[in-house]
Amino acid sequence: MKFIDEAKITVLAGKGGDGSASFRREKYIPKGGPDGGDGGRGGSVYAVADRNVNTLVEFRYTRIFKAQKGENGRGAQCYGKAGDDLTIRVPVGTVFSDVNSGEVVADLAEDGETVCLAKGGKGGLGNIHFKSSTNRAPRQHTLGEPGEEWELALELKVLADVGLLGMPNAGKSTFIRAVSAARPKVADYPFTTLAPNLGVVRVDSERSFVIADIPGLIEGAAEGAGLGHQFLRHLQRTRLLLHLVDISPRWEAGDPVHEARAIVEELRKYDQALYEKPRWLVLNKLDMVDEGEREAVVAKFVEDYGWNGPVFAISALDGSGCSALTYAVMDYLGMLAPRHEAEDPAPPAS
């Protein structure tokens, strides 16, 4: 299935039913009083977050969602039936925004969370409500109110505790395969990953966290180079970023320090809050460095990069260093307050 993380839809709530203007007419009661019932309310449009829904692809093909209108009132004080509500199911992490104003309408971050997107119109009043001492046979009644109508933009931001950041071919997909059951495509060419991948990293029988791999960034992504920064939104909900850097000795045509800085600069251009998120440095492909030179290579990179935050040297291919990294991540996440209790703390020095 193609991964779709943006869509636009129109939601139309149902119109309320009209009130009835009728009079009681029975045998031996030729001039009975008013007995017109009220119209039923229109159906509303709701959205519910469903963990079994993974993308917004359905909304690329069905763009208009309309709830049922309320039935009109009838004589004998019969009230119209309310219109059926319409519920649409979206992935957990879907954000709804008003297309015209840009205002966020709802952010469904929990499974089962529900929001009313468009409220149904009220039903009209029947003429029974307008009877008075001076008007014994009112013909007045009211029409049902129209339901709300909105044009909404949907944006999916995947929910993960940890996000992977890095250049294409930095080994992010290999890493997520090494530490979780996720099986993203891995190949020796750039942009193998074309959509976000999620993996659950279980460090023991009781503790686990979710990690997200997004397509790699390159310098100029903010201006649309490569795949652009269209997938960076999926890192906004994470609590920690792992910046993977390829330190294998294949840099005749490039400088890993420059490229690492370029990635962080793209992050800053996209979103200052994302740039300030806690970030750890992960130096990957250690298996391609001579064993006797590894410590010196790591130390030189850290010095040249000017990094004084947490740093881990790993090989995603053979798994060395991965266990220590995942345990450190789990311990760090365990020290943070749950998502619903506190915001992320200040990032470590970088």
Curated annotation (Swiss-Prot):
The cofactors named for this UniProt entry are: Mg(2+)
Please list where the region (Disordered) is annotated.
17-43
| Residues reported in the UniProt entry to bind Mg(2+) | 173, 193
Q: Which residues form the OBG-type G domain?
A: 160-334
- GO terms for cellular component: cytoplasm
**One GO BP annotation of this record:** ribosome biogenesis
Q: Tell me one GO molecular function of this protein.
A: GTP binding
Domain Obg stretches: 1-159
* InterPro entries cross-referenced by the UniProt entry: G_OBG, GTP-bd, GTP-bd_Obg/CgtA, GTP1-OBG_CS, GTP1_OBG_dom, GTP1_OBG_dom_sf, OBG_GTPase, P-loop_NTPase
Q: Which PROSITE patterns match?
A: G_OBG, GTP1_OBG, OBG
**EC number in record:** 3.6.5.-
Alphabetized, the UniProt keywords read:
Cytoplasm, GTP-binding, Hydrolase, Magnesium, Metal-binding, Nucleotide-binding
Stretches with biased composition (Gly residues): 33-43
Which residues hold GTP?
166-173, 191-195, 213-216, 284-287, 315-317
Q: Does the keyword Cytoplasm apply?
A: yes
Q: Which family does it belong to?
A: Belongs to the TRAFAC class OBG-HflX-like GTPase superfamily. OBG GTPase family.
Q: Which NCBIfam families match?
A: Obg_CgtA, PRK12297.1, PRK12299.1
Task performed by this protein: An essential GTPase which binds GTP, GDP and possibly (p)ppGpp with moderate affinity, with high nucleotide exchange rates and a fairly low GTP hydrolysis rate. Plays a role in control of the cell cycle, stress response, ribosome biogenesis and in those bacteria that undergo differentiation, in morphogenesis control.
PANTHER family linked to this entry: DEVELOPMENTALLY REGULATED GTP-BINDING PROTEIN-RELATED, MITOCHONDRIAL RIBOSOME-ASSOCIATED GTPASE 2
Quaternary structure (record): Monomer.
* Full protein name: GTPase Obg
Organism annotation: Thiobacillus denitrificans (strain ATCC 25259 / T1)
Q: Which gene encodes it?
A: obg
